[in-house]
């Protein structure tokens, strides 16, 4: 007889985890889920195991709104090793080519400039994108290369930090879907020497405050502290969470009176004053502005429900 499935807490919010190096994003997610004893958890765009930095982890009902963070821009600090190209475009891969580093400062500046603004990027074979239902890195591990279409991305800002010997350090502010490993690999080819990532840190995601990032070590320390004080760990852990609607913070807010919100929560579009003419909106209810879901302005100017918060009984 199988054991009944253990249900976690109905905790809703977003934890800004500072992911450690050498850990997969999914492993980090599972550790946070266990620490919080959450019933559901999901991240908002994986970081490579080599990378560190901000990994927003959505808990509970916040997982419904994680898609809006996938569309947000990101900020990275990267250090490239020049003169070596690897099969994964980072230090976790095998060196496949070595070439001398002979470019000038002027050539470097010109090459960097080609990566600023709107560009097309062909994703690495070592990525989680899918081809015919299978992830690209699964093909790559079998030594198979499949066709990939170039995808439009935007590099809002690319700052040169330093070039010392065989190391090049940059800061890159970019749109969703940007592969920093691919930028470095492509840059190495433009410079004629090859390059791969040896250090990568995600500094920011969307408008989340960097100072709210926490490490796994800090979470574990809080759990131990709660045990010593004989209090529930949630009392120390839950205040670290950002609001569940924070992934959609770029969208305008529409507040519904309680007389209208009951219809909205039952799946019906409602009319209200002060709504924008079109697009997605965050919907709140009542004087306290409680978040109840995402809506979209329909052709008749009504706020139609798109994703609703489910309230579980205590």
From Swiss-Prot:
It is an enzyme of class 5 (isomerase). GO terms for biological process: mRNA pseudouridine synthesis; tRNA pseudouridine synthesis. Keywords: Isomerase, tRNA processing. It holds the Pfam family TruB_N. InterPro entries: PsdUridine_synth_cat_dom_sf, PsdUridine_synth_N, PUA-like_sf, PUA_sf, tRNA_psdUridine_synth_TruB, tRNA_sdUridine_synth_fam1_C, TruB_C. Responsible for synthesis of pseudouridine from uracil-55 in the psi GC loop of transfer RNAs. This is tRNA pseudouridine synthase B. It comes from Shigella dysenteriae serotype 1 (strain Sd197). The lineage of its organism: Bacteria, Pseudomonadati, Pseudomonadota, Gammaproteobacteria, Enterobacterales.
């Amino acid at each position: 007889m199988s054991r009944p499935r253990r249900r976690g807490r109905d905790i809703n919010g977003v934890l800004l985890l500072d992911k450690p190096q050498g850990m997969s994003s999914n492993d980090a997610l599972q550790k946070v889920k266990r620490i919080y004893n959450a019933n559901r958890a999901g991240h908002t765009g994986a970081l490579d195991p080599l990378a560190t930095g901000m990994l927003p982890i959505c808990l509970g009902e916040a997982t419904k709104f994680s898609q809006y963070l996938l569309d947000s821009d990101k900020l990275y600090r990267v250090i490239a090793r020049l003169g070596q190209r690897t099969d994964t475009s980072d230090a976790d891969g095998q060196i496949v080519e070595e070439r001398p580093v002979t470019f000038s400062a002027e050539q470097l500046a010109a090459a960097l400039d080609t990566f600023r603004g709107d560009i097309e990027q062909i994703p690495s074979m070592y990525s989680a994108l899918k081809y015919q239902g299978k992830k690209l890195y699964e093909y790559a591990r079998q030594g198979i290369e499949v066709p990939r279409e170039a995808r439009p991305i935007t590099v809002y800002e690319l700052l040169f930090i330093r070039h010392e010997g065989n190391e090049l350090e940059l800061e890159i502010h970019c749109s969703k879907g940007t592969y920093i490993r691919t930028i470095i690999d492509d840059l190495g080819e433009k410079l004629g020497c090859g390059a791969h990532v040896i250090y990568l840190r995600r500094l920011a995601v969307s408008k989340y405050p960097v100072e709210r990032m926490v490490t796994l070590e800090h979470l574990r320390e809080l759990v131990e502290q709660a045990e010593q004080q004989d209090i529930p760990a949630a009392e120390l852990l839950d205040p670290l969470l950002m609001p569940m609607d924070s992934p959609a913070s770029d969208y305008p807010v529409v507040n519904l009176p309680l007389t209208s919100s009951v219809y909205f929560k039952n799946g019906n579009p409602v009319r209200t004053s002060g709504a924008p003419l079109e697009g997605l909106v965050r919907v709140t209810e009542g004087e306290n502005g409680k978040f109840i879901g995402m809506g979209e302005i329909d052709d008749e100017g009504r706020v139609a429900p798109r994703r609703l918060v489910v309230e579980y009984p205590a």
